[in-house]
Structure formats: C-alpha cells, structure tokens
Amino acid sequence: MTSFDSKKAADIHRHLHSHLPPDPALRVKALESLAVERGLIAPETIDAWVEAYSEHIGPMRGAKVIARAWTDPDFKARLLENATAAITEFGFEGNATGHLHAVENTPTQHNMVVCTLCSCYPFSILGMSPAWYKSAAYRSRAVREPRAVLAEFGVTLPDTVAVRVWDSTAELRYIVIPERPPGTEGWDEDRLAATVTRNSMIGTDRVLKGA
Amino acid sequence: MDGIHDLGGKEGYGPVPVQSGDAPFAHDWERRMWGLAREALVPSITIDWFRHGLELMVPGDYLTYSYFQKWATNYLMIFADDGIATLDEIAAGHVAQPAPPAAPKTTAQIVEQVRAGCTDFSTPADTAARFGVGDTVRTLPHGTAPHTRLPAYARDRSGTVIAHHGAHLLPDEGAKGRHVGQHLYTVSFTARELWGADAHPADTVTLELWESYLVPA
C-alpha cells in the first residue's frame, strides 16, 4: 500500500539517485518490465494507448469543437457555460476534462494557459501536450512575461490587447476559443476546423489563417 | 512544498523550445512511459501523491531530467514505496516472482476507457462558502506542508474572486491519501500586483485557489 509518507518517498528518491543509472531509456524499460511481470499492464496496451492518442484523440477534437462554436451561437453559449457538458455532444469527454472551461479571445483580450506547478493539460480534447508546454522555460515565464513568451511563438500583441494567463493549479482545465479567421464566411465546420491550430487552443497562437 | 517544481515566475530558464519541443515525444521510451502512466498501475495512489512524489525528487535531478525521465523515476519511487517492487528488483529490472500477465487492451477499448475516465473532483465541504464572486481576497504568505497548490509567486498577494466552483478535493489532504472537500475559487491577480510596476497594466494572471489559502483582504 502507498505510505503517503513524504520522508520515506524522499529517501527512496535519494536511493534511486545514488544507485540507479540515470539513463531514462533504461529506467523506463525497467519500469515496464516490472509492471508487466507484476501483471499490471500488457505491453500491447501501451501500444494501444499511443495509437488511440495518435489516431483518435488529439487536437483535431478541440478544433472540431471550436469550429462548431464559431458556426453555432447556441453551442458556443453552452460551451462557455459548461465546456465539460458541451463536449459530450461530440463524445470527447474523458481524461482531464471533468472540469473543462472554455475562454474566449476577443479583439481586446488574449487568453493563454499554463501549469506552473506541474503540467496539467486537457488530454481528451487536445491530446498529448507538446514538449514545450512542459518545459521549465514555459512554466516559469508564461505567468511573468507572457508577451515575451508569445513573441517567441511569433505572436506580437499590441498594447490594446490585454493578456490573461490561466495557471491551472487545480483540476480545472482550459481551452482557448481563438477568434474566427477573416475571410471564412460560409465555410462549413470541417473547413473551419482545419484553420484551428493546437497552439491557438493553448493560447500561444492568435491570428489564424483563413483562405 | 517549497520545492524546485514551483517554477512560476522564476528566471533564467531561457527561451521556450517552440520548434524543437513541438512534438509530444522525442524518443520511443518517452512514448512508452506516457502509455504506461495512462493505466492505473498503482490503484492506491492519488493524483496529489503522484505530484508530491515528483516534488520530492532530488532537486538537481528535477531540473536536469527530461519530463518523462522524471515520470519514470517517480513511478519507480512509487513502486518501491507501495511494495510492488523492492529496491533490489528495481535495480535488476525484474521481479523475483512474476504474477499472471495482464490481458492486452485494444485501441477501441482504450478510446472508450478515455471517455469513461471523465473524473469529477467535486467533493462536498461541511461549511458554507466563505467568499463570493467579486470579493477581494489575500493569499497566505506561506504554503502548507507537505503539499500545496499555492505557488510561491502568488503568496501574500491581493486578488479578486472571479468564479466559485463549489467544493473540490483538497490536494493538501489528497497528498496524504485523504479525501476532503474544500471550496475552490478562481482568483484573478493583476500582473502589477504580482510583478510590479513594469508589468502591463491590463494583464492578469488567474489561479485556482482553495479556501484555506485565502483570507479576506
């Protein structure tokens, strides 16, 4: 059983630090072997998880939700009211979206999401997070100098646009609704979804390209 | 805890790896680590104990290990703590007495498992909410031991409650394996309150904060 004993956990960490080669590939191989031999998981199940998140679960889901919000005002109202409930209309609910909140960009407001304490991310709607989202640079700087961080992503904000950074310190997760790109009047949902980038739903991309 | 993981506002970490870090994985072992962690390998842990375990890593390792290297190390700690494997078995990479193998899952089963894994962290509290939307609140100047979700950069600062989410599982207790509900709020802080006069006057940072982290301003 888990001890929930901080001192014991820290002692084990120090032991691992001193006695185990740091090579991450070896550590993961050891972990997988131990888990498989204990009957906790089958190796094929790991492959199935990777395939599920490559083929079925990813930012294409979020993009579909955003495209619907752009074309259906009633859906957008439901999404802003309760995003966890709204994405069940697509069957996209799941891991880490039990408390999902959608936040909307406007001509005078930009939203950006970070998790400074770990790496919380709305997996079932955006898939696996990019490595930069988990980097020390992004986690440390997004709250302190969001405009400088955005500039590194190629986003330059005028002074007239306010930035709100959402630091995910609880089990709430965020998806940004970017502004609909100009020149997309009359486009159907599939075509609109193709304009939505993963980064725009995290808030590190802002101006999407239409035609 | 006031550990190395509490990165918000710290300086010196350089540019964000926008291009080189665009993909979720750089190596196959990262993919396998992520897949392993998707299954509930250790049912008795809590999400807060997992996070707290990462915080308890040797600080130099936390800063220099890649993300999934930290996960692998934390799971090995959890295996040892939980008794799933001894330290000798971890060193050997094999257990002395294997159990019957787990049945493999298909991709379709995983997709359904993801959908069914929509967890609600709402947990009733035995007190009425102390704060309401629009209230000005102040954060405590310190965290709680051993685990807190009040980052150092947002301590002893004044902000405005912009949402009340009812009561949620309190991570401070979750890290001890206890299931306790407490009112949870989204609090907005001006960038100037957090970072001083050089910050943009219109910018804000929001955090989800539990009631015990807050006092009336």
Segments and roles (model prediction):
Chain B
Residues 1-101:
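N-terminal intrinsically disordered, low-complexity, charge/repeat-rich segments that act as generic
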Residues 7-37, 79-82, 121-133, 142-217:
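Basic/aromatic-rich interaction segments and small domains that mediate binding to polyanionic partners
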Residues 102, 111-123, 140-143:
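Short, structured beta-strand/loop micro-motifs enriched in basic residues and often containing a Trp
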